[in-house]
Amino acid sequence: MSEAQYLKRFIFLETVAGVPGMIAGMIRHLRSLRTMQQDGGWIHHLLEEAENERVHLLTFLQLRQPGLLFRLAILGTQCIFVTGFSALYLLSSKTAHRFVGYLEEEAVKTYTNCIKELDEGNLPEWAKLDATKETIRYWGLPENAKWRDVLLAIRADEVMHREVNHHL
């Protein structure tokens, strides 16, 4: 895959990846209000996960701005996914988290393949690309960080999301 193809894939996937944490956090929040009981800190954690996925998206948007057709595809996908995931979460939160865990496993594989291609010299534009100030600040990267370092940080986030969702 080329840099442009990876960017399209990452942008599309990250627009969907932010949904589960937000839906799960909202449903758990409403349940906590309804039952008048603590949630054990999961609401905050799930909302942070959604925010982290949004940061991933914003990171990739620094390199490419999608066109109207792509944005419409995202809108349609989000409408379907929000509805479907909400229903699944209400029916079985355990199944919903397991599903997200598997999606995160696929994300880890995708980022791993991208990093491998970058290391093999198949993505020459990204090999010389510096990390942006925003990514350096967000992930605490060194000032001389490259795009590869950003991809490693994003992959590490996805690994954490995978583990948390398999735990839940």
Question: Predicted regions span which residues?
Answer:
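Non-heme di-metal
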Residues: 1-168
